[in-house]
């Protein structure tokens, strides 16, 4: 099963690469803006190093925990007991992917964010770092032990940010430390983590959010579940909403789900980045667009064919 799935992904990547366009092949203003300000944006923010330090510590953590898997499971192991570093290595979005999520939030300024699949909380921290204190950020995690680790990571991130900020001051007093901590707390939204099976928690969370400006869906890689999440969230979207589906080439089922989602009547633009798919509902886009993109440095040569 593992080799079969990896072969499928390799075949799909070859097709993706051949059809993918770079910033030099796009003229549509909406998509070009996405490329310049999101996909090709390599600006570094001080918070990134703090979050990546947490990722590094997770990759060294050998403690084992027993998991409850509500999703499609892992393609690397089927055991219920897994080490934290195994989870970090296989389940966390990469450094680049997380920075990309940060860019999405930073560019489009969503005020109601939903994440399906908290995992160890690293991607959540990037979403949080790009948000202001008026943003509502809800993240759903099925496994209580993983949720506990995520909460601990968020606390550690807060402490590291405090240390980083205080290091820039001479003669730190208790009052100054308290003032800085209050500023940090006010600058980013509270992360609301909801534990439990998405079948039970998604509806409740959507009712609390009332609208979804941005959703990052990375919790279940089955066709039926993905389509159900899409239709549930769709009822809470507006013209400015953005939905991101992770691992669209994880399996034939996920690719099937992605193809149906991007061709839904309400979608005005879809972008395929291979590792994820993004759909927009922007009514200012008069002609439906389906675009496959890749960073220019990853495709310096232009192929003369596609399929």
Predicted regions: what they are:
Residues 1-214, 221-242, 249-307:
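A short alpha-helical cap/connector motif
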């Amino acid at each position: 099963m593992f080799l079969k799935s990896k072969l499928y992904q390799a075949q799909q990547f070859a097709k993706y690469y051949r059809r993918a366009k770079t910033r030099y092949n796009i003229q549509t203003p909406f998509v070009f803006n996405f490329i310049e300000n999101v996909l090709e944006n390599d600006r570094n923010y001080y918070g990134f190093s703090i979050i990546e330090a947490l990722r590094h510590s997770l990759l060294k953590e050998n403690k084992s925990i027993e998991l409850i898997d509500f999703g499609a499971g892992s393609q690397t192991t089927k055991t219920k007991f897994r080490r934290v570093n195994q989870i970090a290595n296989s389940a966390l979005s990469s450094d680049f992917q997380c920075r990309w999520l940060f860019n999405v939030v930073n560019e489009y300024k969503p005020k109601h964010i939903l994440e399906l699949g908290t995992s160890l909380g690293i991607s959540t921290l990037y979403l949080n770092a790009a948000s202001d204190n008026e943003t509502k950020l809800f993240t759903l995690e099925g496994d209580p032990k993983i949720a506990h680790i995520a909460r601990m990571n968020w606390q550690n991130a807060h402490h590291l940010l405090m240390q980083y900020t205080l290091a820039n001051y001479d003669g730190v007093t208790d009052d100054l430390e308290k003032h800085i901590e209050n500023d940090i707390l006010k600058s980013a939204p509270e992360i609301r983590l909801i534990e439990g099976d998405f079948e039970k928690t998604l509806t409740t969370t959507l009712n609390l959010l009332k609208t979804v400006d941005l959703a990052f869906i990375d919790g279940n890689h089955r066709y039926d579940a993905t389509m159900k999440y899409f239709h549930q969230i769709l009822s809470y979207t507006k013209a400015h909403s953005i939905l991101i589906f992770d691992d669209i080439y994880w399996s034939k089922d996920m690719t099937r789900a992605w193809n149906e989602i991007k061709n839904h009547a309400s979608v005005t633009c879809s972008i395929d980045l291979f590792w994820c798919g993004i759909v927009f509902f922007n009514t200012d886009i008069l002609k439906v667009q389906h675009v496959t993109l890749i960073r220019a440095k990853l495709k310096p040569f232009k192929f003369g064919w596609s399929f």
